[in-house]
């Protein structure tokens, strides 16, 4: 345990803007939970989720991306303006955040071309100029009266938010939303007072901020998010980003510096707005540092894959920023600020940047985290449950699922025995723990091991459980978490000495000398190709299907494709391996037979759940559960969620 106030003096120092006091420099960056009810308001589940983050000690909690245009907004699970409707759930959310000691912030946005970015047909979206989007959507240039209307809408929405109880307003002027569309010289080629030089291109945002101040008074701080650089080929760079910040300086109380313009349809910019595991932690900090050199009145915040409190403290101490924003880290561990303040930094659950949370939110409207099974379930987790009757629980298998099951059961007061047949906890995924871009996985396994060591769990390594052994333990409950095994494809030549499984290569990349062909373009195969490239090993991938298999995580797929493109890794889709030889792989592809030369062949074609191995324990206790990969070969998210669900209700019903 560290002395927090000596170790993190900047991170824990309070901040005051006008009459609004922030208890530290750790802010929750704007997100919405995708839990939206029919009239565009946050659901009660959302209210509970945001309150949980406030309970964790963050200074400010922001509910994000509320569209202000009543006529033209993004369709689907997005929050909408609060002027023309009852705002009771917004008021509940603000109250919930404030009663936990945090500042309640509402982020307002004008979508502009985002309203039609992925759809064709229908009425045109509004934007700086006329254009046709890649998916066929039309954009109409905004006349001045429409621009002035939206400025008024920003002011009116901010006033409604203030009346609903929000303490601060944030404007989304980054990531390709409407205000940034006007800031961008690549998109805004207008010749009137709303386009041309930097001052004109920022006029929309400046007038929106000033309107909010005019209607709400100087006692409500205003923050604006900007992209310090669009980081796309034809976009503006940090020099222009600093000029934009200079125009906003003194109008906004806080300039929150992100990067990117996701309306430009590049995987590389999405992987930086939502920093993927392939980029260093804090990769975007230098943009904020440059902006801070150019502003004199506004505070500057930084964001982007930050999860290490020591790094955060250094950023503030070096004067690179005044505020640290966290998005996914506070989904992964909402207690992060409290753990920093209490000196329990070794217990922080660090985000792996797997992007499951984003993919699930966009795809299904679920708020979820691969390694925090309680997120999105706050109303369930914190409701009163019957006290559990103490049970003796035997967990078989010490991988991701087994560790979580043991910890959850132990936390609920049960007597837990955790058996692992190998000499260490972690399971087969340990093979990836030393991969540089999987540092988050390594941190997570290390944390789970440490928590198990601190608990009262009876850990038995090098213990292979049989039904007979299980019965001698007299368990009330058995949780089978025995995992899965790699599938070995039935291809002629698969047993040759130059053929390896992906797990073996992850453990020992030196097995590969020269060129490699990888069979399978799931995440195991594609990430392995990226990893091998860092060792100077060229690999190409053969995939039977027509696309990368993403396992439901389309967002991480985008990040993987970004790296595949950057590293120039060939993928042969719709191609079947028919024979492995001593010098390569003979395949059948869309254009007929093809031969890919290789010194080594690596198979990564999936995992087989160990159903039978798990089911042999089904009659060894009165209650039996199968969790994780022995139930279904999936991912860490599935392993964690099934483990938590199985363990939480033990002894209660």
Annotate each language-model stretch with its function.
Residues 310, 387-418, 425, 460-474, ...:
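Rossmann-like dinucleotide/flavin-binding elements
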Residues 296, 320, 452-459, 495-498, ...:
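A short helix-to-beta-strand connector/capping loop
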Residues 232, 465-469, 578-580:
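Short loop/turn elements that flank and shape the SAM/SAH-binding pocket of Class I
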Residues 271-277, 322, 429-437, 544-549, ...:
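Short beta-alpha connecting loops at secondary-structure transitions
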Residues 1-396, 400, 404, 408-416, ...:
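Flavin-dependent oxidoreductase catalytic cores
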Residues 58, 252, 474-476, 597:
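Short acidic/histidine-rich motifs immediately flanking catalytic phosphotransfer sites
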């Amino acid at each position: 345990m560290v002395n927090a106030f000596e170790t993190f003096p900047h991170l824990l120092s309070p901040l005051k803007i006008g009459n609004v006091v922030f208890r530290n420099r750790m802010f929750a960056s704007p997100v919405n939970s995708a839990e939206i009810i029919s009239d565009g308001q946050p659901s009660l589940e959302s209210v509970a989720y945001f309150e949980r983050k406030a309970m964790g000690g963050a200074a400010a909690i922001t509910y994000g991306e509320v569209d202000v245009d009543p006529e033209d907004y993004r369709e689907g699970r997005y929050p909408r303006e609060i002027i023309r409707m009852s705002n009771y759930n917004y008021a509940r959310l603000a109250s919930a955040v404030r009663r936990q000691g945090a500042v309640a912030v509402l982020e307002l946005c004008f979508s502009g071309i985002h309203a039609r970015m992925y759809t064709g047909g229908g009425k045109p979206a509004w934007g700086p100029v006329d254009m046709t989007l890649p998916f066929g959507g039309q954009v109409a240039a905004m006349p001045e009266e429409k621009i002035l209307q939206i400025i008024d809408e920003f002011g009116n929405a901010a006033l409604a938010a203030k009346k609903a109880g929000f303490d601060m307003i944030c404007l989304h002027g980054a990531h390709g939303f409407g205000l940034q569309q006007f800031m961008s010289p690549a998109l805004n080629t207008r010749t009137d007072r709303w386009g041309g030089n930097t001052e004109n291109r920022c006029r929309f945002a400046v007038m929106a901020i000033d309107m909010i101040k005019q209607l709400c008074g100087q006692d409500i701080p205003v923050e604006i998010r900007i992209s310090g650089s669009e980081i796309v080929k034809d976009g503006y760079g940090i020099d222009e980003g600093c000029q934009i910040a200079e125009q906003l300086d003194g109008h906004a109380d806080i300039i929150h510096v992100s990067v990117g313009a996701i309306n430009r349809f590049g995987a590389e910019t999405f992987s930086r707005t939502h920093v993927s595991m392939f980029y260093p932690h804090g990769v975007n900090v230098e943009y904020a540092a440059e902006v801070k050199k150019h502003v004199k009145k506004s505070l500057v915040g930084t964001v982007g894959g930050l999860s290490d409190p020591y790094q955060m403290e250094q950023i503030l101490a070096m004067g690179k920023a005044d505020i640290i924003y966290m998005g996914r880290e506070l989904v992964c561990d909402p207690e992060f600020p409290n753990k920093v303040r209490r000196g329990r930094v070794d217990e922080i659950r660090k985000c792996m940047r797997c992007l499951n949370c984003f993919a699930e939110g966009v795809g299904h409207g679920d708020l979820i985290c691969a390694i925090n099974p309680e997120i999105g379930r706050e109303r369930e987790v914190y409701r009163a449950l019957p006290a559990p009757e103490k049970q003796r629980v035997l967990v078989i298998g010490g991988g991701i699922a087994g560790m979580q099951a043991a910890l959850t059961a132990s936390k609920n007061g049960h007597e837990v025995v955790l058996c692992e047949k190998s000499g260490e906890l972690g399971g087969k995924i340990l093979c990836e723990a030393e991969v540089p871009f999987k540092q988050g996985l390594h941190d997570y396994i290390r944390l789970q091991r440490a928590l198990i060591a601190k608990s009262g769990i009876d850990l038995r390594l090098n213990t292979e459980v049989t039904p007979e052994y299980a019965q001698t333990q007299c368990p009330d409950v058995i949780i089978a978490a025995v995992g899965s095994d790699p599938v070995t494809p039935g291809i002629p030549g698969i047993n040759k000495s130059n053929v390896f499984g992906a797990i073996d290569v992850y453990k020992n990349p030196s097995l590969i000398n020269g060129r490699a062909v990888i069979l399978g373009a799931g995440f195991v195969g594609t990430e392995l190709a990226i990893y091998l490239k860092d060792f100077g090993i060229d690999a190409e991938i053969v995939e039977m299907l027509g696309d990368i298999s993403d396992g439901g995580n389309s967002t991480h797929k985008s990040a993987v494709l970004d790296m595949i493109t950057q590293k120039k890794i060939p993928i042969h889709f719709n191609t079947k391996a028919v024979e492995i030889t001593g010098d390569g792989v003979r395949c059948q592809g869309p254009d007929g037979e093809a031969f890919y030369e290789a010194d080594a062949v690596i198979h990564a074609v999936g995992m087989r759940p160990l159903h039978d191995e798990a089911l042999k324990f089904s009659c060894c206790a009165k209650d039996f559960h199968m969790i994780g990969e022995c139930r279904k070969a999936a991912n860490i998210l599935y392993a964690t969620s099934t483990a938590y669900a199985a363990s939480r209700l033990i002894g209660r019903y």
